Amino acid sequence: MRIAQLANFIGPASGGVRTAVAAMGQGYADAGVERLLVVPGPTDAVEETEAGTVVSVRAPRVGGGYRLIVEPWRVVDALERFAPTSVELHDKTTLLPVARWARRRGVATVLLSHERLGDMLAMRTGLDTSARAPIALLNRVVVRSVDRLVVTSGYAEREFRSVAASARCPVTRVPLGVDLETFRPVPSRQRDIAPRDDGVLRLVHVGRLSREKSPHLAVATAVELHRRGVPVRLDVYGEGPHLDELRALAGSAPVTFHGFVAGRDALRRRIAEADVALSVCPGETFGLAVLEALACGTPVVTADRGGARELVDVTSGGWAAPYPAALADAVLDLAARPRDHLRAGARRRAERYPWSAATEAMLAVHAQVTGLTGLVRATA
């Protein structure tokens, strides 16, 4: 089996898509699959890695640290040389011309959808209805262009349910995963924090500081708790275009913006040292930040809708309507519960989502669309 993964809108500091592509790609290689990854880069380059061949295609910057491949034919050149048995798309807009090439060549295509475009654009622009018609048209084009659509949650699946059925495009739900070895609890004796008897409720938010990720809602929740007189501290890890807005929103509340944390172990310690993680975006199709917090033993408060809500249960966190007052209530409810029980429940919840399970499910999808079965090793 020869799988080509294609990703756009990906950069050194980008989050979920980059993490998912890397984790599954390594899993493919470990299973004996020949794997190619094509991504945008500052220059054309080819690198041989233990997880397969990585081809960087020269692409311009489009803001926010991202690069965008604007010449799909150059991706096709890399595919012609690699001769994949299937192509795995991680972008459903700019790379669709590659799906047309694959269909002409008889190469199977799998699209993994990472966002609900309507909700993402609504959160980014504040316009709730104006883009619905063109997005519905795009979704119809998508399901007619690929052989299999993969979604990560029930929330993500609902966007495509009717159009996929009418196009007879099979839809498979594959939850993503978390690195359970990297993201793990910090023993209480090793926590580098102030004594717990100071009474401060420590919150953490990890994510890109861009409107579609709802960092404003996380900050506003901390501000609401501060307004109520709750001793609270919010540490925000991430960077993005709305930092100045968020600082203004925080005002005099105890909110600290730390920027991007490059080391995963350093980030893990900061998450594990918090009492509650705020991952409150109502438009996430999955929520890798939620799983990473849970894996660190930190309970999560999230919105009562969206893919992230599907990851949290009563043993590992709480949820509320995506408004600061409601989320603040959920935080206080969580803080009143036994800490050790919540931390243990959070870790148990994360352990349901190892990357090996996601990789095996995706390999099964590729086997189905290509008809190549029994050609890969089981992943660890």
State each model region's role:
Residues 313-325, 332-338:
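Conserved acidic donor-binding segment of nucleotide-sugar-dependent glycosyltransferases
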Residues 244-261:
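Nucleotide-activated donor-binding/catalytic signature segment of Leloir-type glycosyltransferases, i.e.
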Residues 108-110, 119-141, 180:
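Nucleotide-sugar donor phosphate/pyrophosphate-binding loop at the beta->alpha transition
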Residues 136, 140, 144-173, 178-182:
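A short, active-site helix/loop in glycosyltransferases that binds the activated sugar's phosphate group
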Residues 282:
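Aromatic "clamp/platform" in nucleotide-sugar-dependent glycosyltransferases that forms part
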Residues 260, 268-274:
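Short alpha-helical donor nucleotide-sugar binding micro-motif in glycosyltransferases
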Residues 299-302:
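Short hydrophobic beta-strand element within catalytic cores of glycosyltransferases
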